[in-house]
A protein has these predicted regions:
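Bacterial N-terminal signal peptides
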Residues: 10-19
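Positively charged n-region of N-terminal signal peptides that target proteins for export
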Residues: 1-4
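Signal peptide cleavage region of secreted peptide precursors
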Residues: 20-27
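Periplasmic/extracellular electron-transfer cofactor-ligation site
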Residues: 31-34, 51, 61-84, 112-115, ...
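C-terminal capping alpha-helices of c-type cytochrome domains
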Residues: 105-111, 118-138
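Sequence context surrounding c-type heme c attachment/ligation sites in exported
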Residues: 53-61, 80, 96-100, 110, ...
């Protein structure tokens, strides 16, 4: 009887610890991501027309979809393997950020989010990607 009780207590404790650590992953990602004022004020020089969205989508599929998912929900095939939670880019919290903030975060990266300034060296292409990220909310 005592063995069963001890086994049950250990299993409940393990389950509690697992849930606690799963929640910690979400907490880790909640850190603020400061964006320099220069970028916050930066305007997107690329019009969000069909050509820009097509180019942005192509870049999205190549570089972003595996983590952020097809629709930007943070549910890509690699998302679960990351240390931090991938944000849902369609939420008002994210979409209220400026285009310049999107540009900065895409270019510079942090933690699990890689920098794309070498993989996507043309600024116009990053702006096309920003336009596509904006379209995910529609």
């Amino acid at each position: 009887m005592k063995k069963k009780l001890i086994t049950l207590v250990v299993m409940v404790a393990a389950l509690f610890l697992f849930n606690l650590l799963s929640g910690f992953k979400q907490f880790v990602h909640q850190k603020e991501w400061p964006v320099p004022e220069k970028y916050v004020k930066m305007q997107n020089p690329v019009k969000a027309d069909a050509e820009s969205l097509k180019e942005g989508k192509s870049l999205w599929i190549k570089y972003c979809q595996s983590c952020h998912g097809k629709s930007g929900l943070g549910d890509g095939s690699k998302a679960a393997q990351l240390k931090t939670t991938v944000e849902d880019l369609t939420t008002p919290k994210i979409q209220k950020q400026t285009d310049g903030a999107f540009f900065y975060k895409t270019s510079e990266g942090r933690e699990d989010m890689p920098s794309f300034k070498k993989k996507i060296p043309e600024q116009e292409d990053i702006w096309n990607l920003v336009n596509y990220m904006r379209s995910l909310n529609k």
